[in-house]
């Protein structure tokens, strides 16, 4: 392959990558969505616009149930059942982003609120003892609150703090 062909191939590759990146829109500061599926205790699939999008709830970490080559962790199935009861498929949501809009898996990162009553889903999962706090910079808006809510659940021995 000549140098000219290598340069041409490089330019085409860069343009293709740029076009693909441009197709991935960040989450606006606030967006309406509807639940399609609950993946596990901290990951859901929603309809955003007309597209299915995977959302990772910011600030919480529920026990694993779907991680490849990883055993189902204590209280993981219960965390999944709990979020299914909070926001079953069809539930209208309001999603709020923080500083960084995607994680290293490409999932959108969001604080999730039920549209009808404003329930802060991330908080409810934490306060009922179905998650541990997970603070990853720069998405730290509620990190102190999550630590407080987890401490409260632990003191009260709710959820995983009692079972595991």
Q: Which residue stretches match the model-derived regions?
A:
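Small beta-barrel nucleic-acid-binding modules, primarily SNase/OB-fold domains
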Residues: 2-7, 14-164
């Amino acid at each position: 392959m000549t140098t000219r062909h290598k340069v041409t191939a490089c330019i085409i590759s860069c343009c293709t990558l740029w076009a693909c990146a441009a197709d991935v829109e960040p989450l606006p500061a606030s967006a309406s969505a509807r639940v399609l599926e609950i993946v596990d205790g901290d990951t859901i699939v929603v309809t955003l616009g007309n597209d299915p999008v995977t959302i990772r709830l910011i600030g919480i970490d529920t026990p694993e149930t779907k991680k490849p080559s990883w055993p189902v962790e204590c209280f993981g199935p219960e965390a999944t059942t709990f979020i299914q009861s909070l926001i079953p498929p069809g539930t209208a949501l309001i999603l709020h982003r923080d500083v960084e809009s995607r994680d290293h898996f490409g999932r959108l990162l969001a604080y999730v609120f039920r549209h009808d009553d404003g329930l802060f889903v991330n908080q409810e999962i934490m306060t009922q003892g179905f998650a541990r706090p997970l603070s990853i910079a720069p998405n730290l808006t509620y990190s102190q609150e999550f630590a407080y809510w987890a401490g409260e659940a632990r003191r009260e021995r709710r959820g995983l703090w009692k079972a595991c």
